[in-house]
Amino acid sequence: MQGWHQVLVIAGISALCTTTVDGASTEDGKAAFERREDTMKRMGRPLYLGIGRVVKGTVAYGPETVVAAETVAALASTLDRTLFPPGSDVAESRIKPEIFTAADPVDQLIAAVKSATVQLVPAVKTGDKAAITAAYDTVADACNACHTRFRKEE
């Protein structure tokens, strides 16, 4: 009888450990989603509101436009695959699960965003609307390439 008791105790401990691991991974996924969402918002706001409005002509070019470009470039330089870990496709996320198995395409898309944002700051510093527009479009296109492939529609 004591043998069965040990088996039941071990099974119970295993079940508790599994529950704890699953709970931790859900929390880790949620934290990863929140970090990704925060990073994208902190990068998107200065791009679309700070520079995009200058491109559209609804806001005048100024020193804050350069700060916006520097912010976008600084944040883009930190992008890597750790923003997209398996399990971060929580209910609030619009990420497609295909991203978790697409390492090479994700790396290429991240490299394209980084490359585009490196060109953004010098273009914005010129103050030339055509140069700013071209650089802005290149960055927006690079960002949208990833969103188109790996983000669900709203």
Each PLM stretch: what is its role?
Residues 154:
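Short Cys/His-rich "knuckle" micro-motifs
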